[in-house]
Amino acid sequence: MSDTARAPVPVTVLTGYLGAGKTTLLNRILTENHGQKFAVVINEFGELGVDNDLVVDADEEVFEMNNGCICCTVRGDLIRILSGLMKRRDKFDGIIVETTGLADPAPVAQTFFVDDDVKRATKLDAIVTVVDAKHLPARLADSAEAQEQIAFADIIVLNKMDLVSEAEAAEVEKRIRAINPYAEIRRATKSDVPISAVIGRDAFNLERILEREPEFLSGEDDHEHDSEVNSVSFEVDRPIDAER
């Protein structure tokens, strides 16, 4: 079958603020016995791929992009990597893009509409946002990215439910609904949601996104990095004493 006759490859964008549990969810997707194979693109803020080190040794291909958000300087790399993956599309059933916790997901999603080759070969299946139920109020207060991650979500995994009371959980859901009244919310502890709840959902709704961001398809975005967030990375050849 020719490339033009093939069905588009479904893409899941996995996002969530730092520490919310998105890498734990990715590990679940990669290791459960569901019979599917995924190509995984992991973006990490900083030069060292910390998240890639946390991903378990699964029989998947991991493409890691460092030193810049997918939504900014790495967008070109994302298009290049996706184009390269299409040459090996018979080796996987879907693509998962795990963004850095500092990313606004809107420009990531734009990638699948502004590049003609990527648009033909792929289909954005869902934006899945993992939310830390315990710390969400603080994140909403100090991070515009955390709000955008919720606003653009098709599916929200409300994680770390074991750390909050029912009253606190209800208040968190109320805060989420004020930002995004449409997304499906799945409560979880340690990101323990069924894989079928986040993969193969055909949940991305372009019309809803255009209502929020009329210029979404223009390929232009006002996203800026948080200037207060920086990363410093270094490698050592011996254990570090955290008390010194």
How would you describe each model-predicted region?
Residues 55-56, 64, 149, 176-178:
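Short, conserved catalytic or adaptor-binding loops enriched in Gly and charged residues
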Residues 39-40, 94-96, 120-132, 150-161, ...:
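Conserved beta-strand/loop subsegment of P-loop NTPase cores
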Residues 137-152, 158:
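Flexible active-site lid/hinge loop adjacent to a nucleotide/diphosphate
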